[in-house]
């Protein structure tokens, strides 16, 4: 019987743990293990985010180059539109008469 009593006690020389205390200890151990898993997953997520940020930073020079290209291309249509507007103002009298003559010839 002494052997039976020794096997149920948590540590030799201490009192036996009640069912509640055993269940509480098991739950505490499970919670601690789950916290360790959560911590490991958070660390993995942090490393992944750092890798994504590093890749994004590698493309900053490419992004700057494309932005510069976009700005140049955006200015070109504006300059072209301004040039066309200037040409139309200079040639309004001649262009209108020539267009009407071509249309009249096609309708006859």
Swiss-Prot record:
- Pfam families (alphabetical): DASH_Dad1
Q: Where is the composition biased (Basic and acidic residues)?
A: 77-87
Presence of keyword Nucleus: yes
Q: Where in the cell is it found?
A: Chromosome, Centromere, Kinetochore; Cytoplasm, Cytoskeleton, Spindle; Nucleus
Q: Give the record's keywords alphabetically.
A: Cell cycle, Cell division, Centromere, Chromosome, Cytoplasm, Cytoskeleton, Kinetochore, Microtubule, Mitosis, Nucleus
- Annotated spans, Disordered: 77-108
- Single biological process term from Gene Ontology: cell division
Principal location: nucleus
Q: Which GO terms describe its molecular function?
A: microtubule plus-end binding
Its cellular-component GO annotations read: cytoplasm; DASH complex; kinetochore; mitotic spindle; mitotic spindle pole body; spindle microtubule
Instruction: Tell me which family the UniProt entry assigns to this protein.
Output: Belongs to the DASH complex DAD1 family.
Q: How the protein assembles, per its UniProt entry? A: Component of the DASH complex consisting of ASK1, DAD1, DAD2, DAD3, DAD4, DAM1, DUO1, HSK3, SPC19 and SPC34, with a stoichiometry of one copy of each subunit per complex. Multiple DASH complexes oligomerize to form a ring that encircles spindle microtubules and organizes the rod-like NDC80 complexes of the outer kinetochore. DASH complex oligomerization strengthens microtubule attachments. On cytoplasmic microtubules, DASH complexes appear to form patches instead of rings.
What is the role of this chain? Component of the DASH complex that connects microtubules with kinetochores and couples microtubule depolymerisation to chromosome movement; it is involved in retrieving kinetochores to the spindle poles before their re-orientation on the spindle in early mitosis and allows microtubule depolymerization to pull chromosomes apart and resist detachment during anaphase.
Report the protein name in the record. DASH complex subunit DAD1
């Amino acid at each position: 019987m002494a052997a039976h009593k020794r096997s149920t006690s948590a540590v030799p020389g201490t009192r036996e743990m009640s069912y509640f205390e055993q269940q509480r200890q098991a739950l505490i151990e499970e919670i601690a293990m789950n916290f360790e898993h959560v911590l490991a997953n958070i660390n993995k997520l942090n490393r992944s985010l750092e890798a994504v940020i590093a890749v994004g930073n590698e493309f900053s020079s490419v992004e700057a180059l494309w932005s510069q290209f976009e700005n140049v291309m955006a200015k070109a249509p504006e300059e072209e539109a301004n040039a066309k507007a200037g040409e139309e103002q200079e040639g309004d009298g001649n262009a209108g008469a020539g267009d009407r003559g071509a249309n009249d010839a096609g309708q006859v």
